Amino acid sequence: MKILIKGAGDLATGIASRLYGAGHQILMTEIAQPLTVRRTVALSRAVYDRRAIVEEMEAVSAKTQEDAEAIMEEGKIPVIVDPKADCRKWYKPDVIVDAIIAKKNTGTKITDAPFVIGIGPGFTAGKDCHCVIETKRGHTLGSVIWEGSAIADTGVPGNIGGYTTERLIRASEDGIIEPKVRIGDIVEKGQIVAVTGGKPVFAQMGGIVRGMLQPGAYVKKNLKIGDIDARAERSHCETISDKARAIGGGALEAAERFEKIKGHYAVVILAAGKGTRFSGERGESKLHAKIDQKPMYMHMMDKMQAFSSVELFIVTGDEKIIEEAEKRGIFVVRNKEPEKGIAHSVVLGLKAVSHSFKSGTDRKSGAPDGILFSVCDQPKLKISTIQRILNDAALHKKNVICAGYRGQKGNPVLWPAHCFAELLELTGDEGGRQMLTKYEEKVRIIETSREELKDIDSKREDRKSTRLNSSHEIPSRMPSSA
């Protein structure tokens, strides 16, 4: 796959090592003056040295798209100065890894690429990325987080050799840095290791200098400019750290999981129902009711924009919904007979997906591994829940996967390929409910919140969802209509 890594510091380099070693094509971005402390093991060094070698990887500074493409052709890694990662527009990566390590999101969006990985604090899986990799040293280091965020930054560095804050070398004043020691030198506590802004910087402990900013860089007072390792192993100064490798392993795991999903699944949004319980005598369409300032149907369509790696379809007969779907690149399947029930929509959607896969030229096979059916009246459903369903399907290809709460099955439901023939025989308004019963032992439930699974079937529920009438209780009906 084509992978874009934002940042080329030591942790980003550890990530690149794992992905590059697994055969993926890597492009890295940096700022004009990288402030990488562990620069001997960081590909960011290519920005000012023109090239950098870390273990088996060679990075070369690239100025243009043509430069970058030529470097990749040689099996090397281009590093391009591009703080906003505008290169993604021509590179068109399958995966973006934000490894800037700013402890906050500096502008990455979940729709920037088919799959987006956030490294460390500042990202939320299902909001601005598809998953987050834990960066805090300890039991969960390198774990893949599919819902929620990494542990918040405490401001206290991880323990190495029994030391935490003491091992950091910080600027004593604003100004230009003048290192007085080199990476790999042994220093003692109290020794002058650098001068910043004309003021000396003293070592707070003894050990080996594992990292130090390049001479001439402009720094701010208290900025981390170096670090000392009490273990005093010189080889540690020239090799990727255990932390960087663990984080890289998490990123590789996530990327490989995504590769099993990419191009193998489809999503069908069902939006052809009349919503009679909602509309009552006035004949209003349920799907056009405003939830959080936008029509209900838009919530699901907008969330599905995070899944550009799978084909998206919507079954509807509503002209306004058709117009909005086409704007978002969602393939429209027209249902001219909604009175036939939701099963008819399921059949129409399945046939459209099958036709698309058979006629596609870039498919590994003529059929998808599975289809996720989602209704349009679950405005609280999270992107992270959809992602977890797809993840599980990629590992359990023969199982039916659905969202649920405490064992109670709900929507969305992902049906594997071996169920397609039976789905085509469905009739009426039951959808796949009876099939879920038939395949009870094959159903895997992705546990989520009760709130996510509620659909809006009455105006009373609509008012509750939009917080206009908080005194009403929403019924806990969790349909398995798909």
Segments and roles (model prediction):
Residues 294-311, 351-352:
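A short, N-terminal amphipathic alpha-helix
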Residues 339-422:
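Conserved beta-loop-beta/alpha segment of the NTase-like Rossmann-fold superfamily
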Residues 329-341:
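Conserved donor nucleotide-binding strand/loop of the catalytic core
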Residues 402-457:
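Phosphate-binding/catalytic loops
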Residues 468-482:
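Single conserved hydrophobic/aromatic residue that forms the stacking wall/gate
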Residues 262-280, 440:
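N-terminal nucleotide-binding beta1-loop-alpha1 segment
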Residues 1-262:
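Well-ordered secondary-structure scaffolds
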Residues 307-332:
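Acidic donor-binding segment of Leloir-type glycosyltransferases
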